[in-house]
Amino acid sequence: GKCADAWKSCDNLPCCVVNGYSRTCMCSANRCNCEETKKLREHFG
């Protein structure tokens, strides 16, 4: 579905690929939401 497509496109978003956190992307409202990635970078970056 659309969420699955959003997951695939996550890897193409700069905020997601920084420091290899692309797999932490969350699909929200059929769009890639990188907010969780930013939070992880604050804690582990």
Swiss-Prot record:
Subcellular location: Secreted
Keyword annotations from UniProtKB, A to Z: Disulfide bond, Knottin, Neurotoxin, Secreted, Toxin
CC terms in the record's Gene Ontology section: extracellular region
Record carries keyword Disulfide bond: yes
Signal peptide (from-to): none
S-S pairs: C3-C16, C10-C25, C15-C34, C27-C32
Protein family membership: Belongs to the neurotoxin 02 (plectoxin) family. 01 (Tx3) subfamily.
Purpose of the protein: Neurotoxin. Causes rapid general flaccid paralysis and death in mice at dose levels of 5 ug per mouse.
Record remark on domains: The presence of a 'disulfide through disulfide knot' structurally defines this protein as a knottin.
Protein name (record): U1-ctenitoxin-Pk1a
